[in-house]
Amino acid sequence: MVRFIEENTKLVEKETGNKSNNDVTTTKKKALQDIIINNGVGLINSWVDSMRACSPTHLKSLLKQSSWLTEHPSALDMFEEILHLSEGKQIVMFLDYDGTLSPIVDDPDRAFMSRKMRRTVRKLANCFPTAIVSGRCIEKVYNFVKLTELYYAGSHGMDIKGPEQGSKYEQILQDSKSLLCQPATEFLPMIDEVYHKLVEKTKSTPGAQVENNKFCVSVHFRRVDENNWSDLANQVRSVMKDYPKLRLTQGRKVLEVRPIIKWDKGKALEFLLESLGYANCTDVFPLYIGDDRTDEDAFKVLRERRQGLGILVSKFPKETSASYSLQEPDEVMEFLQRLVEWKQLRSGA
């Protein structure tokens, strides 16, 4: 366990101009990197374009939508196929929170999950080992979910804790209460410092909201007029240029400041599988459901392991490593309910 953490938390070497094409998959990612690492002031417009690309608000053509659904069919339509793939294997559930268990809302402090969704997740955790993997800090996501029997991976997997009580799977761990993984602890003072600087720097931009998620800082621009995105990008860049050990990633109308370490939601998934005793098992079937770019790290891990599958929550066609799709949290709940019903029937409950 300790070796797993040590091998995956080394600082990433500072990237140079000799970087291979494989390291950057899109021009937009390259533009973002140039702005943050190379102080590319002239590329702010490209960054804003990338912000738009990460926050789709318009319908794609029906032809493109149809083509995308052919490659990433509905997990509800393909439910029997998913069950067939999992036959004889232990299903382990990994769920993002915002946009997956709760709707995306303008005010991130009001991203409440419904009581019906909470009941569904509680039943799910009674059937399968279940983890919430979120960009929010553990304390915030727990205050939304309010289920002690789950595993929680906050701050994009940089803060992991086991269930406090009630999970029938906690016996798998030698001592689930001691399960704790915080690979970025040394960055806490730096993250806190950047948080306060970003609050001060962005206060002139109406609608901007800076959130301290313990091991990362989120700059929400969902309520920022698009005409002001460029100003906000400049404000964030002016702070980030003084912190080469931090990196910036993007999500659905949010900019995320994180330590440059080899740790993400994919690493969190692997850590939890190892903690549960499934690291080298062939009879385990991880199911990861998420809606954001940061969930792609977990989708890619599952593809590389050739084990389990990813389900993207999106109404719009997106480039993704997920195998299936669901359109919104209501569909996620229906999928989870069907999983629970299937398991209960199999168990004779």
Swiss-Prot record:
Signal peptide: none annotated. Keywords: Hydrolase, Stress response. InterPro entries: HAD-like_sf, HAD-SF_hydro_IIB, HAD_sf, OTSB-like, Trehalose_PPase. This is Probable trehalose-phosphate phosphatase H. Belongs to the trehalose phosphatase family. Its cofactor is a divalent metal cation. One of its GO terms (cellular component) is cytosol. It catalyses: alpha,alpha-trehalose 6-phosphate + H2O = alpha,alpha-trehalose + phosphate. It comes from the Eukaryota. It is an enzyme of class 3 (hydrolase). PANTHER family: TREHALOSE 6-PHOSPHATE PHOSPHATASE (PTHR43768), TREHALOSE-PHOSPHATE PHOSPHATASE H-RELATED (PTHR43768:SF29).
